[in-house]
Amino acid sequence: VRARWAVRALLAGVLALAVLSGCAQSVDPIERLGKKAAQKVRASHEPHRGKYRRWGLAAPLAPAPRPVRSPDYGEDPAGAGLPPVLDHVPTRDKVVFLTYGADAERDPRFIDMVRELRLPVSVFLADRAVGPGYARAARLRAAGAGIENLTVGHTELRGLSYAEQRAEICGQQERLRSRLGLHPRLLRPPYGAYDRTTLQAAADCGMAALILWRRMPGRDPESYERGGPLHPGDILRPHVQPREEESRPSVPLTTETARLLRRIQASGLTVARLEDYL
């Protein structure tokens, strides 16, 4: 009998300890789920940690400061009420701006790069060059890219009539509105070519500015300047030329962008969103 009571007492003690330990169970994921599971939980809150190395960067991009006031563009040489034409933003902030055209859709990894690095890029789209149903444009937007106007047909505007230029600019505004629900405020004239009629048509279509890019005399006008130092406020256009008779570029856009990002970091600069400064 005594042995039976001793067994019962021992079982009761074990049960009491189990209840107490259950009530005092820690909510720390390291104790509750185990160290390996807890590391997975914590990692999910830092999805972009270390991704910069995947894209060939030694360190993540520094966060861009928020502009405290709108830049002063000075006198409007084109006339009152017409949008300014910019190849740089007058700012002392240590930032530059990355802008792209249709080549942003040609490199399938570019969308991943924008999302993982949280690149504040601006992509100018022409209806002629956009993929079916604007699907990739929608993915670019979801990844964080700003979507702006590059006209309907990517046609050189300079020399066209007012009606023709307005149709190109306003027509693409309508397409971006109907397909993506957007109302872009920035226009990039194809090939950087424009005239006073372009400015008037752009103003009538609701454009706030015409955006060019930093050039270098004697170099490829479609490319950003490769030599010389970068300056705060530079508007850059990473660009790669497709191989002859091929739709894919000879150098992936992600490779060219990573090369430029390393140069930006080496210059003590970072990338800011162009729309935040305009």
Map each language-model feature to its residues.
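His/Asp/Glu-enriched short active-site or ligand-binding loop at hydrolase and phosphoryl-transfer sites
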Residues: 193, 198-232, 269-278
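Active-site beta->alpha N-cap acidic-glycine motif
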Residues: 60-156, 175
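CE4/NodB-like, metal-dependent polysaccharide N-deacetylase domain
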Residues: 115-116, 120, 146, 162-195, ...
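C-terminal motif of bacterial Sec signal peptides marking the signal peptidase cleavage site
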Residues: 19-22
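Bacterial N-terminal signal peptides that target proteins for export
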Residues: 1-10
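Bacterial signal peptide processing site
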Residues: 24-26
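C-terminal domain-boundary segment and adjacent tail
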Residues: 81-91, 130-131, 251-278
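Structural recognition of the beta-strand scaffold that forms the well-ordered cores
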Residues: 96-99, 121-125, 146-149, 185-188, ...
